[in-house]
């Protein structure tokens, strides 16, 4: 007796955007329909929207191709950004010293699921 699959996920690893900045965008699309999320991402000025758009596209494609779910019935069930590896750089300063610069990366995950019938 196979259980009906109602969700699909997509992940992007080591994306060159700070997790804190990615979370600002992910918080706006969480619990929205997929079409509404696309519209929001299209008009937000944040630089992380392009990477998040790609991950959302991949999650929707996984739902359609792997589980035969209808795109119109999908919502963004989960969307989160975890911390990836940090690129450590140095900025030269006065008197031969240097200050550390941390270039942060993220692991983006989006889960889409079918709307629950009321």
Swiss-Prot record:
Pfam families: Ribosomal_L22
InterPro entries: Ribosomal_uL22 (IPR001063), Ribosomal_uL22_bac/chlpt-type (IPR005727), Ribosomal_uL22_bac/org-type (IPR047867), Ribosomal_uL22_CS (IPR018260), Ribosomal_uL22_sf (IPR036394)
Alphabetical GO biological process terms: translation
Molecular-function GO term, any one: structural constituent of ribosome
GO CC field: cytosolic large ribosomal subunit
NCBIfam families: rplV_bact (TIGR01044)
PANTHER family in the record: CHLOROPLAST 50S RIBOSOMAL PROTEIN L22-RELATED, LARGE RIBOSOMAL SUBUNIT PROTEIN UL22M
Family assignment from sequence similarity: Belongs to the universal ribosomal protein uL22 family.
Subunit structure: Part of the 50S ribosomal subunit.
Role, per record: This protein binds specifically to 23S rRNA; its binding is stimulated by other ribosomal proteins, e.g. L4, L17, and L20. It is important during the early stages of 50S assembly. It makes multiple contacts with different domains of the 23S rRNA in the assembled 50S subunit and ribosome. The globular domain of the protein is located near the polypeptide exit tunnel on the outside of the subunit, while an extended beta-hairpin is found that lines the wall of the exit tunnel in the center of the 70S ribosome.
Name of the protein in its database record: Large ribosomal subunit protein uL22
Organism: Leuconostoc mesenteroides subsp. mesenteroides (strain ATCC 8293 / DSM 20343 / BCRC 11652 / CCM 1803 / JCM 6124 / NCDO 523 / NBRC 100496 / NCIMB 8023 / NCTC 12954 / NRRL B-1118 / 37Y)
The organism's taxonomic lineage, starting at the top: Bacteria, Bacillati, Bacillota, Bacilli, Lactobacillales
Gene: rplV
